[in-house]
Design a protein with these regions (language model features):
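Active-site segments of SGNH/GDSL-like serine hydrolases
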Residues: 125-128, 148-179
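Serine-esterase "nucleophile elbow" of acetyl-processing enzymes
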Residues: 24-96, 112-118
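Internal alpha/beta domain cores that form substrate/cofactor-binding pockets in large enzymes
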Residues: 53-56, 83, 87-117, 129-160
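Solvent-exposed loop/turn segments at secondary-structure junctions
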Residues: 60-63, 98-104, 127-133, 164-168, ...
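Bacterial N-terminal signal peptides
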Residues: 6-16
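Positively charged n-region of N-terminal signal peptides that target proteins for export
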Residues: 1-4
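Catalytic His-Asp segment of secreted/periplasmic serine-dependent ester chemistry enzymes
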Residues: 165-251
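Boundary at the C-terminal end of the N-terminal hydrophobic targeting segment
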Residues: 18-23
C-alpha cells in the first residue's frame, strides 16, 4: 500500500508539471464548468459585505513545491484572479492541505474548519486517497454527505472538486466509481462540481497538456495550476451570478 501511495503521488506530481509548452491553452468546454447549482452565500457576502473567504480543503495536489510554489499554486492564483475580477471586494483564499486523508477523515474536521476559518465557500477536493485505498463507494458517498451536510447547515457554500487525470494512473487506480459518486452527490446536494478529472482529460485529448510527459519544470506546473484557477474562478462567478471584470488566461 505504501509503495502504491508513493508511486501514485509521484505520478500526480509528474502530471502536474507536464504540458505542451508551445501550445498552452486553458480552454474548458462550458458544459464542464457551468450548471444550475448556485452559490447563494457567495452572492450575498460579496454584494452586502464586500468580502469573500474561500477555503480550499483537500489533498496535496492543491500545493506546489519550491520557493515559488505557494504563490504559483491554484489557491493563490484563484485569490489573485478573483481580486482582479471583483474590484473592491476583500478576497481571501485559504489552502488547508490534508495529505493522504480520505473523505471520511476530512468530513470529521469540517466543524472545526467552519469554527476556525469562518468560510463563505469551501472547495472540497477529495476522492484520490479513497480510490487508492479502495474504500467502499457507499462509505465514500456517506462521508461526502456528512461533510456537505455540516457545511450547508452552517450556511457555507460548497464546491466539490474531484481527482486529477493521468493516462498512467488510469491503469493503476480505478478512479471512475469515485468520480461518478461525486457527480451523483453533487447533483443530489445541489452543489457545483469542479470536474477536474474530465477537464484534465479534455486537456490531454486536445493536446493542451501532455499528461504522459514528466519533468521538473516549475513553469509548466504553474501553467497547469493557473488553468485550474481560471476555471474555478469562472465557475464561482457564474454560480454566484457575479459579473466580474473579464480576464482571459494567457495563451
Amino acid at each position: 500500500m505504501r509503495m502504491l501511495l508513493g508511486t501514485f503521488a509521484a505520478l500526480l506530481s509528474a502530471l502536474a508539471i507536464a504540458s505542451a509548452a508551445e501550445h498552452h491553452s486553458c480552454d474548458i468546454p462550458d458544459y464542464l464548468l457551468f450548471a444550475n447549482n448556485e452559490l447563494k452565500r457567495v452572492t450575498a457576502v460579496v454584494k452586502n459585505d464586500h468580502r469573500l473567504t474561500i477555503v480550499v480543503f483537500g489533498t496535496g495536489s492543491s500545493a506546489l513545491a519550491g520557493p515559488n510554489g505557494p504563490a504559483s499554486a491554484y489557491p493563490a492564483r484563484l485569490q489573485d484572479l478573483l481580486k482582479q475580477r471583483l474590484p473592491g471586494i476583500a478576497v481571501k483564499v485559504v489552502p488547508l492541505v490534508r495529505s493522504r486523508q480520505t473523505a471520511e477523515d476530512m468530513a470529521k474536521g469540517m466543524e472545526k474548519l467552519v469554527a476556525d476559518e469562518k468560510p463563505d465557500l469551501v472547495v472540497w477536493q477529495t476522492g484520490t486517497i479513497d480510490a487508492i485505498r479502495r474504500i467502499e463507494p457507499e462509505e465514500f458517498r456517506s462521508a461526502l454527505d456528512e461533510g456537505i451536510e455540516i457545511l450547508q447547515k452552517s450556511g457555507t457554500d460548497v464546491i466539490l472538486m474531484n481527482m486529477q487525470y493521468s493516462p498512467r494512473t488510469d491503469i493503476m487506480v480505478a478512479l471512475g466509481p469515485y468520480a461518478d459518486t461525486m457527480r451523483v452527490v453533487a447533483q443530489q446536494r445541489e452543489v457545483p462540481l469542479f470536474d477536474r478529472l474530465s477537464i484534465m482529460h479534455h486537456w490531454s485529448d486536445t493536446g493542451a497538456f501532455d499528461l504522459f510527459a514528466s519533468g521538473k519544470d516549475d513553469v509548466l506546473a504553474s501553467q497547469v495550476h493557473d488553468c485550474i484557477a481560471h476555471g474555478m474562478a469562472a465557475m464561482i462567478l457564474d454560480a454566484a451570478h457575479l459579473r466580474g471584470n473579464e480576464q482571459k488566461p494567457a495563451q
